[in-house]
Structures are given as C-alpha cells and as structure tokens.
Design a protein with these regions (language model features):
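N-terminal Rossmann-like NAD(P) cofactor-binding subdomain of oxidoreductases
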Residues: 1-191, 227, 291-292, 296-302, ...
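Charged docking surfaces used in two-component/phosphorelay signaling
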Residues: 67, 157-337
Length: 337
C-alpha cells in the first residue's frame, strides 16, 4: 500500500509518522509532501530516511492509496482534486470539508461506516475537542438519547501547532530571565500563567468558530439533534486538552450505569476515584491514545443531568490517531482501491 502524508513537517505530520510505525500500518511505499519551506527536509520512518517533496499540481498521487493531509484548510481545498483524482482516499485533518454534505465526518468509535460513502474521495477528520467529546458521549447515547450538552474546554498550546508550543515555552523563559513576556504572536495575549477565553475568531452568534465546530460537528458525527453550547479556552499547558462536559438525557441515568458503559467503551479509559485523588489530568494523557474520563456525577441542577471530566492528547486521538484509525477501518473492510 502506498501512503502519502501532506504536511509531514508539522506537529500532526510528525505524529503520523510515529503512529504509523507504532501500529505497524501496512505500508509498502511512503511519500512525504510539504510546502516550499519544508521541501527537502528529511525524516526517518522505520529506519529509512525520506525526503519531503514539494506539493504540486502534478501526477505524484497517481499510485497513492491513502493520503493523510494536515497542511491547513487552504492547502486541502487547493489540492483535494489533485490528491484524489486517481482514486486515493484523502483523510483530511483541516476544517475545510467537515460540514460539506458529500464529505463524511468520522470518528471510528462512533460512525465508522460513514467513511464508506465518500463521493469526492475525501473523509474529514473532526475538530480535536469534538473527537474527544463524542468518543465519551457515544456510550452514554446508547443508554439514553442526549438532548443537550454544555462543555467548557481547556485547550493546551499544542492545539495551535508546534510553533505555539515553542512560544509558550519561550514566554516562560522570558518571564524567568527578564520578568516580562516579549514574544506574543500565536495567541492574542500572553498565555504563560494565563488563560484566554477565545480560540479562533468570533462569529455573529457571539460564539467562536471553535465553539461552533463543537455544535455542528457533534450533530453530524452522532446523527443527532443534540444542541451543544461550548466555551473554548486556551490554557498554559503544553499538550493534551481537557473538557468539563454536562449533558441532559431523555431518560434518567444513574452514575453507576454511566460508569459501567464508559468502562467498556472503545477508546475510553475510566479513571474515576476522586476520593483517592484519581481522575484524568492532561499531564498523564499526553502521548496516550485513549480519551480519559472521570469525575462522573449526577448534575444537581437538572433531573436527567450527568456531568463528567475528560482529557486526551489532541495531537494523537484529536488528530493523527483518529485519521489512522479511519484508514485502518477502510483496510479492514476492504474499502481501499
């Protein structure tokens, strides 16, 4: 099988290389693509060195079976036809196609079969916060339909890319050395020792684009009429996002029912013993594949409310891993050219 990675030099592109190696993904030939800035860089995969090729409108994708793309929405839109015209499956990590009616938006633990119908040859990978939330919501949805959701996210610097992680580290360094932050470019304000209650631009709904992604994508992935109200916040940790999630179900559920469902759910690890200080934390979920969930409890304000806390590595399950799992599913059911 011939596999391509578009955006190989970025944080998600590098994670693709690690995950494909870790999971022994069936690759006969690998090709890396990037911009003019990253073309020529060399990376090692399974002991062999690969050079990043310049992404161009040519026939480089003629024999590619699966293309993982993570180079931004503009690049995805510009090159989608070039990537897919010979039959390659394009699994795209950008927001470019997520809400297009003819592009499936897939989280394998929730709606893997949607990936089988892709008129344009494109499968969209959802937003990182949405992925982690729906993996946890799905086993609860099977118990009783979820009517509405309130979520606050606590998103690490890595959600804005490798350069944002470097900026946060630089800010801490500047504070130690001079007591003043001088480097502010990837975030609208200083992030070190701070939280910023805005991720992405504002919309005319008074919600940010990031928050509206959680509303719209959750409904599409889960085939649900659930309404989601989100507040997305940047926090000064390096890696792994966290979310405080409240939901209202049609039928009352006990905490024990919810815990039992989560304990056996695919892609979920239950850590829920707060009396002994056991609960998920981003420091521990970094580099892990599962979404970790805990602090499961009945909501005190509504009869059918459940509240919980989750955390997960948004570069892995929130991006690269989810895309690789989609590809693994397609291979398993024989749905790749």
């Amino acid at each position: 099988m011939k596999v391509a990675i578009v955006g190989a030099s970025g944080a998600v592109g590098q994670e693709f290389l690690r995950i494909l190696a870790e999971r022994e993904f069936p690759i006969d030939e690998l090709v890396l693509f990037g911009s003019e800035r990253s073309a020529g860089r060399k990376y090692t995969f399974k002991g062999k060195e690969y050079e990043v090729k310049l992404l161009q409108h040519n026939d480089d994708f003629k024999d590619v079976d699966i293309a993982f793309t993570s180079a931004g929405g503009g690049t995805s839109k510009e090159f989608a036809e070039t990537i897919t015209k010979y039959g390659a499956v394009m699994i795209d990590n950008s927001s470019a196609f997520r809400m297009d009616a003819d592009v499936p938006l897939v989280v394998p633990e929730v709606n893997a079969e949607d990936a089988l119908t892709r008129p344009r040859g494109i499968i969209a990978n959802p937003n990182c916060t949405t992925i982690m939330m729906v993996v946890v919501l799905q086993p609860i949805e099977k118990l009783s339909h979820i009517k509405r959701i309130h979520v606050s996210s606590y998103q690490s610097a890595s959600g804005a890319g490798a350069a944002a992680m470097a900026e946060l580290q630089q800010q801490y360094k500047e504070l130690v050395e001079t007591g003043e932050v001088k480097t502010i470019s990837k975030f609208p304000h200083q992030l070190a020792y701070n939280v910023i209650p805005q991720i992405d631009v504002m919309t005319d709904t008074d919600y940010t684009k990031e928050e509206m992604k959680m509303y719209n994508e959750t409904r599409k992935i889960m085939h649900s009429d659930a309404r989601t109200s989100a507040t997305c916040v940047s926090v000064s940790s390096l890696r792994s996002h966290s979310e405080s999630v409240w939901m209202e179900t049609e039928q009352p559920l006990t905490v024990d029912e919810v815990r039992k469902a989560l304990a056996v759910a695919p892609g979920v690890t239950l850590e829920d013993d707060p009396q002994n200080y056991v609960y998920p934390m981003p420091l521990e979920s970094a580099g892990k594949d599962d979404v970790y969930v805990g602090r499961v409890r009945k909501d005190l304000a509504t009869d059918n409310g459940i509240t919980l806390w989750l955390t997960g590595d948004q570069i892995r399950k929130g991006a690269a891993l989810n895309a690789v799992q989609i590809a693994e599913y397609l291979i398993k059911v024989g749905n790749v050219k």
